[in-house]
Amino acid sequence: MSNAYEEYMRQMVIPMRQELVRSGFEELTTEEAVTEFMENTTGTTLVVVNSVCGCAAGLARPSAGQAVVRAEKQPDHLVTVFAGQDKDATAKMREYFGEIPPSSPSMALLKGKEVVHFIHRHEIEGATMDEIITNLEQAFEKNC
């Protein structure tokens, strides 16, 4: 049974989830969904580790959405997990990131199950939206 705080948080993050879904991202909300996706997907995947923090709202989510609209080459798949909300799904996805330390928000470009490009929170916080979009576009150009 959930408490009032958990219910409040579930309601509060709905727009934060929808922002990426509207941009074409599939939400993976359970450990099983992550495993199913990762074990049965080929090609390239952009994974956004979503977060409630300000840099996710002002930089990460809008940059990811714009990058997939603007880029000539794009990943085959777009998925997102929500750190702090869908804890099991996020932990499972991070297992596929290998030795890369947990970071949220963050973005990972995978070829199959291999991380070929990663943007950490500290790289998001210190950048402009255009810099993040360019970073992603260059990664897409090289890997997709």
Swiss-Prot record:
InterPro entries noted in UniProt: BrxB/BrxA (IPR009474)
A Gene Ontology biological process term: cell redox homeostasis
Superkingdom of origin organism: Bacteria
NCBIfam families given in the database record: YphP_YqiW
Family: Belongs to the bacilliredoxin family.
This protein's name: Bacilliredoxin BA_2173/GBAA_2173/BAS2019
Organism encoding this protein: Bacillus anthracis
